[in-house]
Amino acid sequence: MRNKLNLFMLALILCCVGCSPSPEAQRQSPHIALVGLGIESSTFSPAQTHEDAFHTWEGDEIFSYYPFFSDSALLQRAQWSPTKISRAIPGGIVPPKTYESLVGKTLDLLKQNQPYDGVFLDIHGAMSVVGLDDPEGDFIERIREVVGYETLISTSMDLHGNVSWRLAENSDLITCYRLAPHEDAWESRQRALENLVDRLESEKGKPAYKAWIPVPILLPGEKTSTRIEPAKRLYAAVAPATEQEGVIDAAIWVGYAWADEPRNHAVVMAYGDDQQAVGETAEQLAEHFWNVRNEFSFVAPTGTLDECLDQAIESKKKPFFISDSGDNPTAGGAGDVTWTLTEVLKRPEFKSTSGPSLIYASIPGPELIEKAVEAGIGSKVEAHVGGIVDDRYAPPLLISGTVRAIVQGDKNAETEVVVRVGSVDVIVTKKRKPYHTEADFTRLGLNPRETDIVMVKIGYLVPELYNMQADWLLALTPGGVDQDLERLDYQRINRPMFPLDKDMEDPDLSARFVPVSGQDE
Ligand SMILES: [Zn+2]
């Protein structure tokens, strides 16, 4: 009897240790939900982004999505409730049905494990939804409806996102990348998460002061790379500013130039517990931004397409990269504008197989893919490519050439075909895909390093392509993310706006203090 009782007691103790932490332990370890929704979507493109374009991670999959969770120290600092992360490569505007579906599924999962001490909200910040302004502001309000205002929300963003007053108010902590290209994307998210855990562990809770300053500047990302001045120095000033006593974090958003809402402009924020330090930090960064506004220029020399091609054909340097920037799918272009490829194939230099070698990456063309797969490698194929989504500048293009490669299984493209037309290797995809790595080319049997000219639908070159180029020009081609912002027909952004309104007066760059969430007077 005595032994039985002891075993029973032991089982009871083990169960208590294993299944539910003591109330003491529960207090020490905050309960945090992980939530994410991200896309950058252009309203100047006829493309739409539907739910099937979003990659999603649910439940425990989310721990492997974030590389920093391999650090068990961070894992052990909280009880985590991963919900749903949805991300799409940039594209066109999101229909309300897709938005409601993604938000609804995420909120349903969020409702399951309440209450929360914290929510980590991972967004891009430049989502556009048909008929809905400021989707991220809407999303965070709906998260608040679920979790209430006792919960701290830490929002992590892309520096090309937009920060409305509503988003700033509902976020207790908020930050964004400090590098473009975004080599610090994971590090920034980790900072947002660690700041949240710190505030919960220390029981300091919501920061007392959040300063928000709208800066009336709207610039394309291709003019604001932090690899070159003036963005390099501007963004380098952020980290030291956050070392001050009473300042938790600060951030500068360039904002998103290819959507037309009042929230599309640059923003500076700082927050912490010392009102003066917070206000001054935000004001200094905002003034710095405004003072260097005239120094922003394109990351590479630019030209019309013909100017770029003339120079590349003339050049002895190879590979000579040309960015087909107006239809860059990673900024929100449809990715199927045929204008550039049409112009390239018209050039006499590329008509013969002995012309300068050129790789064109890439154009979606499901009709050609189907014919090429049927005909096989080495066969002649003729079919239309592109112009299904965005035919405003040129119609679908009939190309006729030899199939050089057929590769199946890419997660974005699904099927990729290389068709040789004259001296041009055209990469045709079933679905649109950005070409950002050397392997993207070599997988298809192409050698970009030994090619005279490589044209990519991209803006600034991502690091791997940048390191490969012998020379580089950015062609100002038409499309949904036209780099020449003055060609865009803005109706709803705030005016005056630099550089659209050249002679505007200096704006008011004093700090506006956003109410602590839930304390709106
Ligand atoms: Zn970005």
For each feature predicted by the language model, list its residue ranges.
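Active-site histidine-anchored catalytic micro-motif
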Residues: 33, 38-40, 44, 96-100, ...
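N-terminal glycine-rich anion-binding loop in soluble enzyme alpha/beta folds
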Residues: 26-109, 265
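Short acidic/histidine-rich motifs immediately flanking catalytic phosphotransfer sites
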Residues: 113-118, 316-318, 451
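C-terminal motif of bacterial Sec signal peptides marking the signal peptidase cleavage site
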Residues: 15-18
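Hard-cation-handling environments
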Residues: 30-32, 222-423, 427-431
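Sec-dependent signal peptide recognition
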Residues: 3-10
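Internal, active-site/partner-interface "lid" segment
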Residues: 200-231
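Extended hydrophobic packing segments that form well-structured cores
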Residues: 82, 104, 290, 412-521
